[in-house]
Regions:
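Metabolite-binding pocket within alpha/beta catalytic cores that recognizes anionic/polar moieties
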Residues: 2-149
Length: 149
């Protein structure tokens, strides 16, 4: 039996958009760039050859378009792990829940998420303002303790 998400668990706006992000499932690409500041979204999207949507809802801004022939979404998360949790949870819902039936879709849709922006560092040899590329990240905030799996 498929899991059903009650209206209190999955908030969908009357226009079919997910509650916090204001994005509809068809407006989400499989490749998503996450930035903190909403002002960075148009900066990243300026590299798109075309844009299909530009959505500003609360502190979240989302632009989906095409970059070098590939469909991509760039979205702001705001500041902090709480906001990032909301974004990632709602991105998964957009990709993997049928909004009409409120059930998990039969085929899993994998999203590729790339974080682009500023970060703290715990290594003494990394200076403020230095550019780094990470393969992984580790949160010391305890958020993962709230998830099963």
């Amino acid at each position: 039996m498929k899991r059903y998400f009650a209206p209190s668990e999955l908030l969908i706006e009357p226009n079919g958009a997910i509650y916090h992000l204001g994005v509809k499932p068809e407006q989400l690409a499989d490749k998503v760039i996450l930035v903190g500041d909403p002002g960075r979204v148009p900066l990243v999207a300026s590299h798109f050859s075309e844009q299909e949507c530009d959505i500003q809802h609360r502190e979240f801004r989302t632009i989906t378009g095409t970059y070098k022939g590939k469909r991509m979404t760039v979205m702001s998360t705001g500041i902090g792990i709480g906001n990032i949790d909301i974004c990632v949870t709602e991105l998964d819902a957009l990709a993997n829940i049928d909004f009409a039936t409120r059930q998990v879709k039969p085929e899993f849709r994998k999203l590729t998420l790339v974080r682009l922006g500023t970060s703290g560092a715990i290594q003494e040899d990394i200076e403020v303002g230095e550019t780094i590329f990470s393969r992984t990240s580790l949160g010391f905030d305890g958020l993962l303790n709230y998830y099963k799996g």
